[in-house]
Swiss-Prot record:
GO terms for molecular function: sequence-specific DNA binding. Homooctamer; tetramer of dimers. It comes from Pyrococcus horikoshii (strain ATCC 700860 / DSM 12428 / JCM 9974 / NBRC 100139 / OT-3). Pfam families: AsnC_trans_reg (PF01037), HTH_24 (PF13412). This is HTH-type transcriptional regulator LrpA. InterPro entries: ArsR-like_HTH, AsnC-type_HTH_dom, Dimeric_a/b-barrel, HTH-LrpA_regulator, HTH-Siroheme_Decarb, Tscrpt_reg_AsnC-like, Tscrpt_reg_AsnC/Lrp_C, Tscrpt_reg_HTH_AsnC-type_CS. Keywords: DNA-binding, Repressor, Transcription, Transcription regulation. PANTHER family: HTH-TYPE TRANSCRIPTIONAL REGULATOR PTR2 (PTHR43413:SF7), TRANSCRIPTIONAL REGULATOR, ASNC FAMILY (PTHR43413). Residues 2-63 form the HTH asnC-type domain. DNA-binding protein that negatively regulates its own transcription. Interferes with RNA polymerase (RNAP) recruitment by inhibiting the association of RNAP with the TBP-TFB promoter complex. SMART domains: HTH_ASNC. PROSITE patterns: HTH_ASNC_1, HTH_ASNC_2. Residues 21-40 bind DNA. The lineage of its organism: Archaea, Methanobacteriati, Methanobacteriota, Thermococci, Thermococcales.
C-alpha cells in the first residue's frame, strides 16, 4: 500500500508531471532524495506507469471531441477494437460494460468530419452494429 505522502506525490504529478522534486519536497517537508526514492518505488510497483502530456485539440484544429459508443456483433468485438486502434482520430479506446461494448474518444475537425468518421470509417467496419457519438461541450475536470 501507499501512505499519505505517496498519495500527495501522485496528486501533484498527475496535475503536472514536470513538477520538480525540489518543489514536491518543500510541500511535503521532506528531502528531494526522499521524494526521488518514493517516485522510483511507485514506478517499480507499477503505480506510476509513465508520464504524459495533455494536448488541447482545439489548438490543433479539432473543434469537436466526442466520447463515442460502438457496438459490435459479439464475435467481432476484438477485431473491431483492433481496427479502431489504427485510426488517428481515435485518441483513446476502451472496452466497456454498460450501454456500449467499446468507448472511443474521437477528435474531429468539424461536424462534416465527424459525420464522415462515423458513417464512412467506423460505420463501415465489419461487425459494427451501432455508433453513438456524444459531443463533449466542456471539460470540467
Amino acid at each position: 500500500m501507499i501512505d499519505e505522502r505517496d498519495k500527495i506525490i501522485l496528486e501533484i504529478l498527475s496535475k503536472d508531471a514536470r513538477t520538480p522534486f525540489t518543489e514536491i519536497a518543500k510541500k511535503l517537508g521532506i528531502s528531494e532524495t526522499a521524494v526521488r526514492k518514493r517516485v522510483k518505488a511507485l514506478e517499480e510497483k507499477g503505480i506510476i506507469e509513465g508520464y504524459t502530456i495533455r494536448i488541447n485539440p482545439k489548438k490543433l484544429g479539432y473543434s469537436l471531441v466526442t466520447i463515442t459508443g460502438v457496438d459490435t456483433r459479439p464475435e467481432k468485438l476484438f477485431e473491431v477494437a483492433e481496427k479502431l486502434k489504427e485510426f488517428e482520430f481515435v485518441r483513446e479506446l476502451y472496452l466497456s460494460s454498460g450501454d456500449h461494448m467499446i468507448m472511443a474518444v474521437i477528435w474531429a475537425r468539424d461536424g462534416e468530419d465527424l459525420a464522415d468518421i462515423i458513417s464512412n470509417k467506423i460505420g463501415k467496419i465489419d461487425g459494427v452494429t451501432k455508433v453513438c457519438p456524444a459531443i463533449i461541450l466542456e471539460k470540467l475536470k
